[in-house]
Amino acid sequence: MELKGIKKYGTVEAKVRKVAESMGEDVEYLFMNWSQANVAMDAITKPSVVYVLPPSGKLDFSYARVKDYPETQIGFLAPTDFDFDGTENDNIIEQMKRLAIKFVKALNASKCFELIEGKQPYQVVYDFLDQNVTGIVLNLPLEEVDGIIICDEESRYEDEKEGS
């Protein structure tokens, strides 16, 4: 299932946002750093996909296009009450794992990135922000399939001269 219009977006963030939005109105999407998320989560009342502003990455230059490979952190967080015994929060962690699975499935279906497969480590988030949230954070290897076209011509003038 390729998301309509997603190929026209030039940034990794726009592609991630489009995937998150395709998951329905029951999921909030945030793109910001952890400090901004700390403030924003105060007003959030539903499970959220938080794409943390990447601190670094790699640009892969080839003849006709550039592909972006950001170092990503994507949080799957839900507001929670502070729970000392952890029973309720364990249930929320499992729900956020399911949200992460749904997100990765949608990401793979978008065909904007190389397939995410294999073992993907996660970190459990509990009492990490000022607002009580519970969830997980994945560091997903987002590798663009198409990237950005930087050369509209199919061949170079030098290549045509050599063939003569």
Question: Where are the language model's segments positioned?
Answer:
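Short, solvent-exposed beta-strand/turn "edge" segments of beta-rich domains on protein surfaces
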Residues: 60-67, 127-131
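Acidic-leaning, charged glycine-interspersed low-complexity segments
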Residues: 20, 24, 44-49, 93-145
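Hydrophobic secondary-structure block in the mid-to-C-terminal portion of proteins
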Residues: 134-164
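Intrinsically disordered, low-complexity acidic/polar segments
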Residues: 61, 81-83, 147-151
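Extracellular/virion structural assembly segments
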Residues: 1-21, 64-69, 76-105
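Small/polar-rich, solvent-exposed N-terminal microdomains that initiate assembly or binding
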Residues: 1-64, 152-164
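Oligomerization/assembly interface segments of phage tail-like spikes and tubes
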Residues: 66-82, 132-146
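Short, internal active-site loops enriched in acidic
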Residues: 35-37, 77-79, 121-127
